[in-house]
Amino acid sequence: VISFARGVPAPECLAVEELADCARAALERNGRTILSYGPGGGYGPLREWLGERHGVEPGRIVITSGSLQGFVFLAQQLVRPGTRVLVEAPTYDRPLTILTRLGAEVVTVPMDEDGLVPDELPEGEFAFLYTIPTFQNPSGRTLSLERRRRLAELARERRLLVLEDDPYGLVRYEGEPLPSVFELAEGEQIAYCSSFSKTVAPGLRVGWFVLPAQLAAQIEALAVSTYISPPYLSQATVLELVQRGSFEPNLERVTGLLRERRDAMLEALELQMPEDASWTRPEGGYFVWLDLPSGPPAADLLAQAEAAGVTFVRGTDFFPGGRGGERSARLAFSFVSPGEIAEGVSRLGSLARAAAPASL
């Protein structure tokens, strides 16, 4: 099966030998500490490094077992049944599942080609706004600089907490980097999270949050009550990679491998899709969003595609209650080879063209 379903790095992106060496070095240097329990907010030296990177005190950094675990903690702290939470439409499906499980009322904010539309934020009280401004999951879109400034302004004016999720920001193939909303707002009303899953390795399970001091303490307490302390060995391994100067060269290598896949995906879509199809052209990240106005419903297309040996994620999965994306698909290009991408999109294209009206 050719899978466009999961946003995970290809096996060749993983620096196995160097990470093994980093883990060995970390154990030799500080093994008795990193093999024991410790503070629930994470490995102190890595918190210090992240604090310097973001210009905050280390106590405002909480390192979690992947950033999604941190999202669970944040939602548990802020959400009760009936609590209103804002999300982009479409948005990452796993936070939708978490919020629904907690009984939140999920309210959507529309997007266009420039990302979330800040001036469409509805009035009222909300626990927070969840946004992925850079190379968004699932759409691949990036929030423009003007809109980032506007979002920071609105967050300040309305005292709205914004959770900026930024796991893909460093995985850029072209174009100039944009400042984060957190940077533009100088941290006011913005909580920031990211992860080493897309830049180093997902199996390390190292994500982090930059939070207001009081909220950071509350989230750390939740972490302690949940798993006592996060795994320090993986955090120390990441820190060793950073401190020996290997993070940036590895990121450049990973970005090059993923750029080839992004290019292969865009080329294949251009060749294979019916004339009325449209798709995003991300400058980074892992995903392309495909719209097929004349195609079958995404659930039907997925069933046909799986029978043809291809899988993807239905657009409906990224909208609360499945209300949207009925003829859309998220295609992840990060895991499969360029050759597999060409073949998989060819199979999808055949199915899409077969469903399109003859005039197309």
Give the residues covered by each predicted segment.
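N-terminal "arm"/small-domain region of PLP-dependent enzymes with the aminotransferase-like
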Residues: V1-G40, E52, L160, E306-T311, ...
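Conserved core of the PLP fold type I
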Residues: R32-R158, G169-G187, L258, A356
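Glycine-centered flexible beta-alpha turn that most often forms the glycine-rich phosphate-binding loop
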Residues: D165
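Active-site PLP attachment segment
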Residues: F182-Q218, P230-L233
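Structural signature of PLP-dependent enzymes
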Residues: I219-T226, V242-L266, G295-P297
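Conserved glycine-rich beta-strand-loop-beta hairpin in the small C-terminal domain of fold type I
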Residues: L239, G256-L266, A277-D291
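Short, conserved charged micro-motifs
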Residues: P296-L301, G339-E343
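PLP-dependent enzyme catalytic core of the Aspartate aminotransferase-like
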Residues: A307, G322-L360
